[in-house]
């Protein structure tokens, strides 16, 4: 088995190091990841500037681009084989609910899915500098083993979130639906010493709906959350209503 690993926290992040090491029990692992942190870049693809690749050591490639760039570089240029699985992570911080629309970690799994390769996005629900990444890596191995054995439905990947706690405290995985997060006041404006305005985005408070069956509900109770996500964003129920409109 050939497995490619990427992330959005950068190739030196502890999460990707733990993940790559753990996945070697399943087969050959190649890491193709951003050369620095690229969190919250979404599904960005670099089209207007060249990309550079640095081989840090055997099987570890740093790309000066986004997670989506890394998937493309790995599949079309760097890997001598088409991977059987692409695993993105382990992200430093949860990717729950609406977070997935911003996440570079999830975007890498989306890109792999677009290319017809089974994919998993893995995140650790922590804000601590040193979270339980080895424990999350072992969860990733268990999920990866199932995907390699059973495959995934077409246009579907798995978004896995792991609670940040010792292995003995992690409760059994739950298959969940995507929850809903709401952000309040997440833009702050400041003035620099020269009197010019500048802004910070993302520093506001975030709330979420803790509904049973959601990824939030599972993580808050120390369960592993496994959410199958698919690429077809069509709202089929709304199609019937909108077809009655007069354009």
Curated annotation (Swiss-Prot):
The record's annotation in Pfam families points to: SurE (PF01975)
Q: What positions does the entry give for a divalent metal cation binding?
A: 8-9, 39, 91
Please name the top-level EC class of this enzyme. Answer: hydrolase
Which InterPro entries does this UniProt record tie to the protein? SurE, SurE-like_Pase/nucleotidase, SurE-like_sf
GO molecular function terms here?
A: 3'-nucleotidase activity; 5'-nucleotidase activity; exopolyphosphatase activity; metal ion binding; nucleotide binding
UniProt keyword Metal-binding present: yes
Per UniProt, subcellular location reads as: Cytoplasm
This enzyme's EC code(s): 3.1.3.5
Q: Which cofactor does it need?
A: a divalent metal cation
Q: Does the keyword Nucleotide-binding apply?
A: yes
Q: Which UniProt keywords apply?
A: Cytoplasm, Hydrolase, Metal-binding, Nucleotide-binding
Specify the superkingdom: Bacteria
Q: Which reaction does it catalyse?
A: a ribonucleoside 5'-phosphate + H2O = a ribonucleoside + phosphate
What is the cofactor note?
Binds 1 divalent metal cation per subunit.
Cystine connections: none
Q: Kindly state one GO CC term assigned in the UniProt record.
A: cytoplasm
Report the sequence similarity comment from the record.
Belongs to the SurE nucleotidase family.
Main role? Nucleotidase that shows phosphatase activity on nucleoside 5'-monophosphates.
Protein name (Swiss-Prot/TrEMBL): 5'-nucleotidase SurE
To which species is this protein native?
Pelobacter propionicus (strain DSM 2379 / NBRC 103807 / OttBd1)
Q: Which gene encodes it?
A: surE
